[in-house]
Amino acid sequence: MKSTPKLLLLLLFIINHHVDSGSIVKFLPGFEGPLPFELETGYIGIGEEEDVQLFYYFIKSERNPKEDPLLLWLSGGPGCSSITGLLFENGPLALKSKVYNGSVPSLVSTTYSWTKTANIIFLDQPIGAGFSYSRIPLIDTPSDTGEVKNIHEFLQKWLSKHPQFSSNPFYASGDSYSGMIVPALVQEISKGNYICCKPPINLQGYILGNPITYFEVDQNYRIPFSHGMALISDELYESIRRDCKGNYFNVDPRNTKCLKLVEEYHKCTDELNEFNILSPDCDTTSPDCFLYPYYLLGYWINDESVRDALHVNKSSIGKWERCTYQNRIPYNKDINNSIPYHMNNSISGYRSLIYSGDHDLVVPFLATQAWIKSLNYSIIHEWRPWMIKDQIAGYTRTYSNKMTFATVKGSGHTAEYKPNETFIMFQRWISGHDL
């Protein structure tokens, strides 16, 4: 009987250690049978008191997890849950597009998961995004620079709890608004690796899809993109160029000619699906809509059985929302231009893959090409098509700063529009091969 307290203490230690390190998920409601891959979910506490709890989904590589690269995936927004990447862009599961009937929506396996060749951490950030939360009221408004430091701390703590992945090549990745966070994060990790007494992160590079980089410039390139895609007439294009002088969306109220022309531009484009101009602009609650699975996602992830299976802290969050910061949570966008971070990361010698769906109106490929050109690195491999079998899947170019730019033909703002092509592009690049 005297040994009982010691046994209880040991048991508590084991339980606490298990919770801190994450919990293995073997089954998910909506998916038949055990998961055909290893999924871990959990929280990592940030700050001295660890009041900020960042939620993650970790999926081991299906090939060789001990040696394959470790990726961190951040969804955009800011404030969109990373499970949108997992279930819609590059994960091993997807929601089956079937009319909602009141039961838990179904999940199916995918053929295009990046986890076939990489370990991936899908991270919900900032605080309030997905299942990440704070135990106490926030004192400071979440911000770009604040999130960079939080994510860096997350990675350090996650790797200390998963030391078997410390030597794996590490890549930061994401799309859309992550274009403001990932380059700064790479620089932060790079600097942190030189600080004494902390195990270095084996940083090798980064990957960004349709990244927001310099919002005003990104936005202005919508005009030449729209002209090139035959969305506006030659006459309107020439007039708007002449009278707006390259500034189309932050117009001086006194420039009435420009304002009128911009109004004409909106008449031509406002009814488009700006995320992919080839796709219908329709209500996601319609089963005929390409994005109907987003509607199903809300029902799936808010089901109590799903949240239990994912080991979500019951007291942490109410109704899950796909993107929170766009509507109701304050956020300080204090990085307005991420080009200097790209420059610093290039100087430091990190590899990068920057890809653009070529039918995205939100961040047109022309804007991405422009800031890459502004880095002023020489071209190593000239513009050429990259192929899948005997078909052109997009176009690519490589630069002397180890940066590869690629378009994905027919794709939009995120990889979900062409997941198979994006997967093949990623698989070739991460393996060090030409696209």
Curated annotation (Swiss-Prot):
One Pfam family recorded for the sequence: Peptidase_S10
Specify the glycosylation sites in chain numbering.
101, 313, 336, 344, 376, 420
User: Which EC numbers characterise this protein's activity in its record?
Assistant: 3.4.16.-
Q: Which cysteines are joined by disulfide bonds?
A: 80-323, 244-258, 282-289
Q: Which SUPFAM superfamilies match?
A: alpha/beta-Hydrolases
Q: Where in the cell is it found?
A: Secreted
Enzyme class, spelled out: hydrolase
Q: Which GO terms describe its biological process?
A: proteolysis
Domain of life assignment: Eukaryota
Q: Which family does it belong to?
A: Belongs to the peptidase S10 family.
Q: What does this protein do?
A: Probable carboxypeptidase.
Protein name as annotated: Serine carboxypeptidase-like 12
- Please tell me the species this chain comes from: Arabidopsis thaliana
Organism ancestry: Eukaryota, Viridiplantae, Streptophyta, Embryophyta, Tracheophyta
GN (gene name) = SCPL12
